[in-house]
Amino acid sequence: MSAISQERLLQVLLAPQISEKATYVADKNEQVVFKVATSATKPEVKAAVELLFKVEVKSVQISNVKGKSKRFGKMMGRRKDWKKAFVCLKPGQEINFVAGE
């Protein structure tokens, strides 16, 4: 497998997914949840998290999330589909999004 370019890795992670479920998973299983690019793969997500946050990743699970149907005035529209990555960190590793560091 060829090395993944650093430019590509910087485009893979879009944002941390902060929700009630993500907080529960983080506390119970030492996992962090990210919104990722729809074309992202597990090895890319793992490499991007290790590069940006300087932590060791144990495993990555990815799920595709279907966009919701929404009304925009009289018209029915649809939000975009997106991808969610559950990143399991090795014991002793942690990413803190609340602190300003």
Swiss-Prot record:
This is Large ribosomal subunit protein uL23. It comes from the Bacteria. PANTHER family: 60S RIBOSOMAL PROTEIN L23A. It holds the Pfam family Ribosomal_L23. The lineage of its organism: Bacteria, Pseudomonadati, Pseudomonadota, Betaproteobacteria, Rhodocyclales. GO terms for molecular function: rRNA binding; structural constituent of ribosome. InterPro entries: Nucleotide-bd_a/b_plait_sf (IPR012677), Ribosomal_uL23-like (IPR013025), Ribosomal_uL23/eL15/eS24_sf (IPR012678). NCBIfam families: PRK05738.1-3, PRK05738.2-4. HAMAP family: Ribosomal_uL23_B. Part of the 50S ribosomal subunit. Contacts protein L29, and trigger factor when it is bound to the ribosome. One of the early assembly proteins it binds 23S rRNA. One of the proteins that surrounds the polypeptide exit tunnel on the outside of the ribosome. Forms the main docking site for trigger factor binding to the ribosome. One of its GO terms (cellular component) is ribonucleoprotein complex. Keywords: Ribonucleoprotein, Ribosomal protein, RNA-binding, rRNA-binding. GO terms for biological process: translation. Belongs to the universal ribosomal protein uL23 family.
